[in-house]
């Protein structure tokens, strides 16, 4: 139930253009300080997963592993996506509170 609420909110954030998708773009946004929250697919490759988690830890950006690449892509209206960065503080805080509930 909570996971569905997360995906619904992700869809709204994507339509508001507050979501960056794709591994390299997410890493770039984390480095630039624009990413407020990062969502990572649980079926991401070890290399991609480690790279994104290390960047988030270093730059002190909260991240969560949720769903698979098809769930993340479907929630944002795109094809499969391994990583998503939320650039809006309001969406990020709401998603974070939902993800920390479960």
Each predicted region: which residue ranges?
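Mid-chain, well-packed structural core segment of small domains
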Residues: 50-81
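Short, ordered loop/turn segments at secondary-structure junctions
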Residues: 24, 43-44, 68-71, 89
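C-terminal structural segments of small proteins and small subunits
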Residues: 8, 70-102
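Solvent-exposed alpha-helical segments within well-ordered globular domains of core cellular machineries
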Residues: 8, 28-32, 50-54, 93, ...
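N-terminal positively charged helical leader segments and presequences
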Residues: 31-53, 60-62
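Structural motif
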Residues: 17, 36-37, 62-64, 81-84
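Absolute protein N-terminus
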Residues: 1-2, 102
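N-terminal first-folded block
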Residues: 2-40
């Amino acid at each position: 139930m909570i996971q569905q609420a997360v995906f619904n909110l992700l869809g709204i954030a994507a339509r508001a253009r507050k979501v960056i998708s794709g591994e390299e773009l997410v890493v770039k946004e984390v480095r630039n300080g624009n990413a407020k929250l990062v969502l990572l697919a649980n079926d991401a490759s070890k290399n991609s997963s480690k790279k994104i988690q290390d960047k988030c830890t270093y730059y002190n950006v909260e991240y969560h592993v949720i769903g698979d690449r098809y769930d993340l892509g479907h929630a944002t209206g795109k094809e499969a996506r391994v990583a998503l960065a939320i650039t809006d503080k309001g969406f990020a805080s709401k998603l974070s509170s939902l993800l920390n509930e479960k």
